[in-house]
Amino acid sequence: MEQTFSDMSVQMAVERAGASELVMMVAKDVHDVLRPNEFVLEFADTTSPGFHSALAVTNYRMLIGVGPGQLQEIAVDSVTRVDAVRAPEVTLLVRVYNADVTVYGLGDRGLRRIFHAFNWIVSQNAARPAHADPENSIADMYNEWIDVQRFLHENPDVSDEEGNQRLAGMVANKRWW
């Protein structure tokens, strides 16, 4: 296949996905929005947005083509679980904190590639450096924790979901580790 993209991660992922016309269209959109130090791990065909499209997994985001020049974005840092359901059709269930994102129409091959990409991301996140200098100190984390607790006690009408989101957002903040 001739080289279409200047970013080799996009080029190689497109080739692995089969380089269909729709994958190429979404790949161009993904190529245009790549951030510094971001690279594409895999592409796969999907029918998730209600029509034939493609899904990309990068080292930072999952991107689904939802229209010409439009991508739905899910930060991989917010993904807490990835599951597959094979009946009645192959479906990818991506758990984002307390919500599920369902991706339909991947096919077995696409599902395997997307799972492989997520497994790589998990393995990289699990292999944290032995020594890290967090942006903020333990005292800062404690103070933010107290602020969240104070807010929850001063606002008893806050729903459990909102309270959980505030706590999860504070704990998941990568400045702490």
Question: Which residues make up each language-model segment?
Answer:
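Acidic, Ser/Thr- and proline-rich intrinsically disordered linker/docking segments
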Residues: E2-H31, D45-G50, V66-W177
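Cysteine-dependent deubiquitinase/ubiquitin-like isopeptidase catalytic cores across multiple families
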Residues: D32, E38-V40
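Polybasic phosphoinositide-binding surfaces of eukaryotic membrane-targeting domains
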Residues: G50-I64
